[in-house]
Structure formats: structure tokens, C-alpha cells
């Protein structure tokens, strides 16, 4: 009888421990968490700004626990980037940028405004000098304001601002990162990791969710509406001169 009781106690204790371990594992990997994945693609312009305003407001209203911005953009309008940066900074939800291809110019500014940055192995970020629509360098006043904005974005997320400044100011000298004086800084994933501009390098979304301990979270993928697609097309700087 005593042996039987000991066996039952052992079985119960083992089962209880496994149950607790399983529950803790679920919590640790995002069980009952809600994650919004919002794309930042193509040019940064007013249409993208409106899309991000709508989707981040929706994420907030739905009680999202995390927002992931999947970034692939060559850059775009400085004014729209500034407004989107404010939208991101005003969020009370943890944010992560996943650079799937490139976050150049205004794209790097947006990434720097998020809490975390992860990069695909072939991704790049930087090259953020301000140019006019005809491809010439902007005036000194505009350049100075943009450099200050890049610095502020880096500082807001606890990153060393000298690299953000070098992305926007070709007068900086960082030859060890392939950006001697006269060149804008562009970071590879390994370089971004080295200077503290990326938390990790991941090949896909599954790996990213694992790194963020959100593997078991409920995922909501945001997408543009037809009206937003039209608005983005009409706001494209290539299209505007034709209209």
C-alpha cells in the first residue's frame, strides 16, 4: 500500500510539474498575446502615412501587445517620415522593425523610431541624405533639420546617434564601416549588430517571432484597402508630375 501511495505521489508530482512547465512555456512564447504585422513598403509618402495611422490605431483599439513593422522601402518624403515617426513614438505598445530588404533614407529613420530592429541577412539600412525631387542635394537648412531628426530618432531608442548622423551627413568620417568622408553610411546586418543598431539577424518571420518570444501569439496581418492603394498610387512622386 505504501509503495502504491509513493507511486501515485510521484505520478501526480511529475504531471503537475509538466503542466506548470507547459503553461510557463506558453506564456514565455506569447500565448494569449496579440501581434499586429504592418508592412512599410515602397515609397514613404502621405498615403503610407494614412495607412499607418489607421492600422496602428486599430492595433491599439484591439489591445495588441506588440507591433511588427516589416520594412522594405527606398525612402521618400521627409515630411511624411516625420509624421510617421511621431505616430510610432506615440504608441504605448512595444514595436519592432523587421527590415526584410532595405530601409534606406526615410526608411532608416522609421526603423530607428522603433524599440527593436531585426534584419534579414541580405538587408541594408542607411544612406539617408536629403535630396530634392530632381535628385540634387537639399539646401543646408533642410539637411540640418534632417540630421537632427535622425539623431533624435536614434537617441529616442537608446542607440548611439553618431551612426544615424553618418547616415544623413556625408561630412562624417567612418572608414571602418565603408563610409569615409563624402559617403553616406549604409549598414549591413552584421555591421548594424556590431554598432547596436540591430538586435538580431533573422531569415524569416517565424525566426523573428521566436526571438521576440511570440511564437504562439495570435497574428494579425494588416493590409491596405483599395482606397489606400489608390491614394498611395496618386501620392507617388513619379505619378504626381504626370497628373
Task: Please tell me what each predicted stretch does.
Residues 20-234:
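Soluble extramembrane regions of membrane proteins in the secretory/endomembrane system
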Residues 1-5:
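Positively charged n-region of N-terminal signal peptides that target proteins for export
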Residues 234-243:
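Core alpha-helical transmembrane segments of integral membrane proteins
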Residues 6-17:
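Bacterial N-terminal signal peptides
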Amino acid at each position: 500500500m505504501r509503495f502504491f501511495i509513493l507511486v501515485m505521489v510521484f505520478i501526480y508530482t511529475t504531471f503537475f510539474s509538466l503542466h506548470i512547465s507547459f503553461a510557463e512555456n506558453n506564456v514565455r512564447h506569447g500565448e494569449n498575446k496579440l501581434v499586429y504585422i504592418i508592412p512599410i513598403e515602397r515609397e514613404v509618402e502621405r498615403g503610407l502615412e494614412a495607412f499607418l495611422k489607421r492600422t496602428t490605431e486599430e492595433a491599439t483599439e484591439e489591445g495588441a501587445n506588440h507591433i511588427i513593422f516589416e520594412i522594405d522601402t527606398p525612402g521618400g518624403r521627409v515630411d511624411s517620415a516625420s509624421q510617421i515617426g511621431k505616430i510610432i513614438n506615440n504608441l504605448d505598445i512595444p514595436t519592432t522593425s523587421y527590415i526584410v530588404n532595405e530601409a534606406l533614407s526615410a526608411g532608416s529613420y522609421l526603423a530607428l523610431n522603433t524599440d527593436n530592429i531585426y534584419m534579414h541577412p541580405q538587408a541594408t539600412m542607411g544612406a539617408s541624405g536629403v535630396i530634392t525631387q530632381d535628385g540634387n542635394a537639399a539646401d543646408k537648412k533642410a539637411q540640418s533639420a534632417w540630421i537632427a531628426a535622425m539623431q533624435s530618432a536614434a537617441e529616442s531608442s537608446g542607440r548611439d546617434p553618431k551612426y544615424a548622423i553618418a547616415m544623413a551627413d556625408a561630412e562624417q568620417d567612418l572608414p571602418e564601416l565603408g563610409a569615409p568622408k563624402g559617403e553616406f553610411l549604409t549598414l549591413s546586418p552584421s555591421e548594424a549588430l556590431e554598432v547596436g543598431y540591430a538586435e538580431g539577424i533573422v531569415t524569416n518571420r517565424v525566426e523573428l517571432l521566436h526571438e521576440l518570444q511570440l511564437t504562439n501569439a495570435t497574428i494579425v496581418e494588416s493590409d491596405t484597402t483599395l482606397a489606400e492603394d489608390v491614394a498611395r498610387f496618386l501620392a507617388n512622386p513619379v505619378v504626381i508630375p504626370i497628373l
